[in-house]
Amino acid sequence: MVFDYESEWASEHTATPTQKVHHVDEPLQWFRALADHGVTADVVPVRGAWDDYEMVVLPSVYLLSEETTRRVRDYVVGGGRLVVTYYTGISDEKDHVWLGGYPGSIRDVVGVRVEEFMPMGDDFPGVPDCLGLSNGAVAHDIADVIGSVDGSATVLETFKDDPWTGMDGAPAIVTNTFGEGRSVYVGARLGRDGIAKSLPEIFESLGMAETGENDSRVLRVEREGADGSRFVFSFNRTHEAVQIPVEGKIVVSSFAEVSGENVSIKPNGVIVTKQ
């Protein structure tokens, strides 16, 4: 999961299509939706070392420099799996808008060309409050008007709403082959629930397992110390007690009760074990 403070600052200026959408919100929605499928994502700065991950998400990364563009292209060409959302690649690092449509310098990587945006909500008379998708997800606040889809790309989901919106049947989620890798473009703000609903098809199109190895009720994070010791943090994500097996020696616990080889973690509870 790529995060970029400069993209957050850029997305806050008043020249954007809507003031309801900022970069900082989108990584959190994707992180939570992935966790709902048992996948714990690492959050890495845009200049960090994300090139070796099996899958990378660019969630509304508003600014794409030429250097980041090169890294993205090399990553996918080399076999990486990339997910890109709306509001990505609008401008370069100096906030100069990329010409020719969006997502700017990586249009061919994702196989789409976005020509304009549809902001939504009661701040904009004559536009819908939301848009439905063919998979049952609902888009809020903003949707991309995808003007063209490359021949190498396949539309996974379309918008499905009243014809007067002008978006009924338009592409919403598109997958593309680029080099040895694949990409998925998500052209709307779907929120946690809509992302979670769309992830099985996204995973399948990228050739990945639909769920991760972790219990979706528990956020599991591993950290390794300088001496090689490994610590596992297990957080209860639900409003009910969750029972999990004890891994290693419990060194810290909060709102948790051990019973034999299992531990019951109450809501807001956490345990830390040393392996």
Where are these regions (language model features)?
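Carbohydrate-binding surfaces of carbohydrate-active enzymes
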Residues: M1-Q275
